[in-house]
Amino acid sequence: MGRSKSFGVIVLTILLLVTAAVNAAEKPFVEIDIYSVNDFHGHLRAEAADPGMAALAGAVSELMKQNPEGALLVGAGDMFSGTIDANEYQGQPVVIAMNKMGFAANAAGNHIFDYPLEIIKKQAAAAEFPLLGANILTAAGDKVAEPFRPYTMLQKQGLTIGIIGLTTLETRDKASQTNLQKVKILPPEEVAQSYIDELRNKGAQIIVLLTHIGSSQGEKTAVEGEIIPLLQKIQGVDAVITGHSHLCVSGEYNKIPIVQAGCYGEAVGRIHLLYSRADKRVVAAGARVYKLDQLPKVQDAAMEKLLAPIFKDIDARYNAVLALNDQLLTNDRNGESRVGDYFMDLLKSGFKADAALYNGGAVRADLPAGTVTMRDLIKIFPFDSTIYVGEVQGSDLRQVLEHGIGNPNISRLRFAGLQVTADTGEPEGQRISRILLADGSVLADEKYYKVVSNDFMFSGGDGFASLKNAQNLRACGKANTFFAFALRSFKTINYPAADDRLQIKN
């Protein structure tokens, strides 16, 4: 009698599963919701304006309950690095947290190459989702570089969804040049259409571009940015997820929904697709961004428990006080940065250089008033570059300033030891009208100057190609090691609110 009852339960279960599958297949319309996070940059813990991963996980979980059978979650790149919590463990805490949230895929961003390829392979091995980068090839250019995959295919509501991963061509300039040596970044348009066609031939009914490619949008304007020229050259895409520009975008191009969800876990993107089985295509679509501060706050307790030991370990090692700061020093990546000025002054004096230079994108946070800890320092300089000293000709130094000041494509150059007058309304090559050294002398194009900077800049990163001409380069250790030593030595920071190192006419 017991066996008969068990057999009956098994048969009933099978019938229910079959019936559910049939019902799903018979639905004339299917709703698919693709939720996305981009440019998280390792902001795992809640502090200041950052919601933290527990809040992000809670918000995503609640949103996905609206369509549990038809929802999926993806990442649009630059997830694994950018804070001490992530960097100290080579991105693994973010990977583990994303596993717990159930990410279905993650596109490779330019900052994936903050890590060497060997570390990226370890991240991919730990991830329960594929790391996508269809335009990231081996150095020989013969195939997609491991551990990246060009696309993934998955099933939702009886539909086959193909997701293609693409990264910005700006990765060539906005990533560690050393770590890029083993790969070749192709223009996305050179590979996108072939993979779209391949997925269609394999039966994909919905195709999504999961990209770390920039987009932007005014309050009432169409979507713009790097993603649009790509979309003008391809066809057959149903949805586009973007990243890289750290903006909230929800719009469309040629009726293709496009989304981007800010940065640091502040928001979640959503693309809603309505698929018609009769028409065998997406017949309606929309894009939306949910800001976490506008949603009911739901903390994921399991995520908090998962991350607590990591935070405890980091705090124990990096909360020691380095110095006391008299006043807040702010950082505007596209404008003035007294933080950048202060640390460039430390570099110039510490290495007895004529000038100190730093790419503005490497300076990421304010320096708070009061106690300054190693955690604070790493928030400012999360990528911990290597310091280099070299001899740079005046004409090349002038070109660095022309490229780094008033350039809308990169964060403003940080420097010390120079007094510069610039007209940012002029094109590159005509912006700088005066450059004085600390002794009041005018920069001489033919003369060589002692310059201290970082490995990223001396290797031509961010387009600072003229620095590749530097002579007698020598490595001088990690930047954060030097900065921490300097702060401990001075013990107090009393830095003026402004100076005249940069005078802008326009």
Across the structure, where does each feature detected by a protein language model lie?
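Flexible, polar/acidic helix-loop-strand segments at domain edges
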Residues: A365-V392, D396-G404
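Bacterial N-terminal signal peptides
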Residues: I10-T19
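A hydrophobic, small-residue-rich beta->alpha segment in the mid-to-C-terminal subdomain
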Residues: L443-S489
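Acidic, metal/ion-coordinating pockets
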Residues: A24-K312, N334-S349, A356, T371, ...
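A glycine-rich phosphate-binding loop feature that marks nucleotide/adenosyl-phosphate handling sites
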Residues: R288-K291, L324-L329, L357-L367, F415-E426, ...
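Charge-dense polyanion-binding interfaces
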Residues: N409-L437
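Bacterial N-terminal signal peptides that target proteins for export
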Residues: M1-V11
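Glycine-rich phosphate/diphosphate-binding loops and the adjacent beta-loop-alpha structural elements
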Residues: R317-E336
